[in-house]
A protein has these predicted regions:
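Glycine-rich phosphate/dinucleotide-binding loop and adjoining beta-alpha-beta core of small-molecule
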Residues: 1-35
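Short active-site-adjacent structural elements
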Residues: 23-26, 49, 75-82
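Charged C-terminal helix
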Residues: 75-98
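Short, small-residue alpha-helix embedded
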Residues: 42-73
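Short, charged, surface-exposed loops that flank catalytic or proteolytic processing sites
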Residues: 1, 60-68, 82-87
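Glycine-rich phosphate/pyrophosphate-binding beta-alpha loops
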Residues: 37-41
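A short structural micro-motif
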Residues: 13, 73-76
């Protein structure tokens, strides 16, 4: 409910990152993304997510589509991360492609 309220109040697409990231936009049904894990709590990974949203926007998606795609890709990358390898914002950013 908070994501939808924020999106409606500001007239924007909102991403509330956490365990079960929510993407909401005016006139859209909010999307709950279940990919991702605690590794994304690392400093800077939210900045990587913001850059990934921007990359999807630059590729021609609308804001809601870009946010949904980026959130899923970001989370799936963490889920697929090799065991025993540290996930840092820098290594995450270098591995992502749009």
């Amino acid at each position: 409910a908070a994501a939808r309220q924020l999106a409606d109040a500001l007239g924007c697409t909102a991403v509330l990152k956490g365990s079960g990231t929510v993407v909401a936009a005016p006139g859209q049904i909010p999307v709950l993304n279940l990919t991702g894990n605690a590794r994304l709590g690392t400093a800077g990974t939210g900045d990587v997510l913001a850059g990934l949203v921007a990359a999807h926007l630059a590729a021609g998606q609308n804001a809601f589509q870009a946010a949904c795609a980026a959130v899923h890709q970001h989370g799936q990358s963490a889920d697929d991360w090799p065991d025993g390898e540290a996930l840092t914002a820098g290594t995450l950013a270098r591995r992502l492609r749009v």
